[in-house]
């Protein structure tokens, strides 16, 4: 991802690249995320205000941004179809990806914009009357968060996970993670192994557990399923 500043001109071009309803009348930074650059876009359509999320995806971390967007489109379309079939609220029950303003764009190009400096942009409808919390304020909030992640798994229980791209290759490959841990432990490059002896002993005593899920998946003993894998509070809208 480029380190060049996101100028007003770049923002205007990015806004024009998506099929936002109405005329853009305000652009503001959104949130305190440390991975992507996010903005709230406000538009005016005959006196009606609408809001959208416009975001620059960090391609230093997500090296296959098209694959990431294909995943999001496939997953959200599956959830949306399920909500509609069950009579649920498909507008608020899942993310809605905003399409490109280029009506000739096809495939994943219809859901993203790459600017003059190589930044990868995407956009969503803003889900009004929701909050994103950084800290847990009550047991009820904790229960709602648990329900949300559990419901996400339920909604995707019949989804073909084999069609998804791996967003960050081997990020959750515990077998490779454990091998990297043992390699670092053997080298002890900054001389801190002795100060963590108790924690290291705990991990090495459970080495056989490190590859259990990966091995069972490879052997067909576990079914391949979609998982969220970043189930923290700030990734939920309440």
Model-predicted regions and their roles:
Residues 48-71, 77-163:
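ATP-binding pocket architecture of kinase catalytic cores
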Residues 22-44:
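ATP-binding glycine-rich phosphate-binding loop
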Residues 1-28:
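Juxta-kinase regulatory segment immediately upstream of eukaryotic protein kinase catalytic domains
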Residues 38-40, 123, 226:
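Conserved hydrophobic/aromatic beta-strand scaffold that supports enzyme active sites
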Residues 13-14, 37-40, 71-78:
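Residue-level detector of alpha-helical secondary structure
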Residues 2-5, 28-32, 55-56, 62-66, ...:
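ATP-dependent phospho-/nucleotidyl transfer catalytic cores
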Residues 231:
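Hydrophobic HxD+1 residue recognition
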């Amino acid at each position: 991802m480029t380190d060049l500043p996101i100028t007003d001109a770049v923002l205007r071009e990015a806004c024009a690249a998506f099929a936002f309803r109405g005329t853009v009348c305000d652009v503001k930074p959104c949130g305190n995320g440390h991975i992507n650059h996010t903005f709230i876009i406000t538009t005016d359509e005959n006196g009606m205000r609408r809001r959208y999320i416009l975001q620059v995806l960090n391609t230093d971390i997500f090296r296959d941004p098209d694959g990431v967007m294909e995943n999001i489109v496939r997953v959200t379309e599956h959830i949306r179809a399920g909500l509609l079939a069950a009579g649920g609220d498909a507008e608020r029950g899942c993310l809605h990806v905003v399409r490109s303003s280029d009506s000739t764009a096809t495939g994943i190009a219809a859901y993203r914009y790459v600017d003059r400096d190589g930044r990868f942009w995407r956009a969503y409808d803003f889900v009004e009357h929701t909050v994103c919390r950084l800290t847990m304020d009550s047991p009820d909030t904790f229960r709602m968060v648990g329900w949300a992640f559990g419901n996400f798994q339920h909604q995707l229980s019949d989804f073909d996970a084999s069609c998804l791209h791996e967003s960050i290759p081997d990020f959750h490959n515990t077998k490779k993670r454990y091998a990297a841990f043992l390699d670092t432990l053997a080298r002890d490059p900054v001389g801190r192994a002795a100060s963590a002896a108790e924690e290291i002993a705990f991990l090495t005593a459970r080495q056989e557990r490190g590859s259990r899920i990966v091995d069972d998946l490879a052997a067909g003993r576990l079914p391949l399923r979609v998982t969220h894998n970043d189930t923290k509070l700030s990734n939920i809208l309440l």
